[in-house]
């Protein structure tokens, strides 16, 4: 737990940096999820599907943690699912990197999911990630939320592969 906390804080503190590598973002989300598993007495599972060869690409810092936090707090924690699971997928396709956080928790209506990205909800963590994706990548970046009540939620991010940081 101590190692997970120190890793999480080390990778989260921004030191003025808005970009990080995929490898550091993976370290951050793994540390965050370890902390959450301890806090939840391992009452949910985490399944990772991470492609090789992506470690050195630059991405916006802290794009996965808010998504995982919402999946746990608003999906897994409030679900009656007997096998609560959070899936973390990172893969590449052509000139893009795809990130997905998915849960089999409570879910929500698609209308409510759409409102999260259009300033019609009170939350700001997920919307902040969406805003940063649009500022950094414009039409080349994308974030979508798909959800079904009682089935779970899938948050999907697509960004171009970059090896140099564009500063916000």
Q: How would you name each of these model-derived features?
A:
Residues 1-146, 152-156, 167:
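Two-component histidine phosphotransfer core
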